[in-house]
């Protein structure tokens, strides 16, 4: 019995196409997790119960510093003396001038703005 020499190449091509299709479908399934940065629903529940200080440590410390002194973002010390709570809330909510928006859950904006205004 004589085999066609193209059969091994054909089998490899079919296997490659099948593997590519499978990995593409798998990637689409994982896209939601990738888009959320790997956070699960339990992380969302944790954020809902987080204190302003915990939210700060999770989202703000990289730019505003461990002691609120400012790193790449401005210092938060005494910001309550310069701006009222409503202005601080708007800044946290909408961002601007290099600050991203949406870092604080909407239901925690008032608590966070009040907390930031009291930093001395």
Swiss-Prot record:
Residues 26-120 are periplasmic. One of its GO terms (cellular component) is plasma membrane. InterPro entries: Cyt_c-like_dom (IPR009056), Cyt_c-like_dom_sf (IPR036909), Cyt_c_BACSU-c550-type (IPR012218), Cytochro_C550_firm (IPR054780), Cytochrome_c550/c551-like (IPR051811). The chain crosses the membrane at residues 5-25. It is found in: Cell membrane. The keyword Transport applies. It holds the Pfam family Cytochrome_CBB3. Binds 1 heme c group covalently per subunit. It is a single-pass membrane protein. Keywords: Cell membrane, Electron transport, Heme, Iron, Membrane, Metal-binding, Transmembrane, Transmembrane helix, Transport. GO terms for molecular function: electron transfer activity; heme binding; iron ion binding. Heme c binds at residues 60, 63-64, 99. Its main location: membrane. SUPFAM superfamilies: Cytochrome c. Not essential for growth on minimal or rich media. PANTHER family: CYTOCHROME C-550, CYTOCHROME C-553-LIKE. This is Cytochrome c-550. The gene is cccA.
């Amino acid at each position: 019995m004589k085999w066609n020499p193209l059969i091994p190449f054909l089998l490899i091509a079919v296997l490659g196409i099948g593997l590519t299709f499978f990995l593409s479908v798998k990637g689409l399934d994982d896209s939601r997790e990738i888009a959320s940065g790997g956070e699960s629903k339990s992380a969302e529940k944790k954020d809902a119960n987080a204190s302003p200080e915990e939210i700060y440590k999770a989202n703000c410390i990289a730019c505003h510093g461990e002691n609120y002194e400012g790193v790449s973002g401005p210092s938060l010390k005494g910001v309550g003396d310069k701006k009222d709570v409503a202005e601080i809330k708007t800044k946290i909510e909408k961002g601007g001038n290099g600050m991203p928006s949406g870092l604080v859950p909407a239901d925690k904006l008032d608590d966070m703005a009040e907390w930031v205004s009291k930093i001395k």
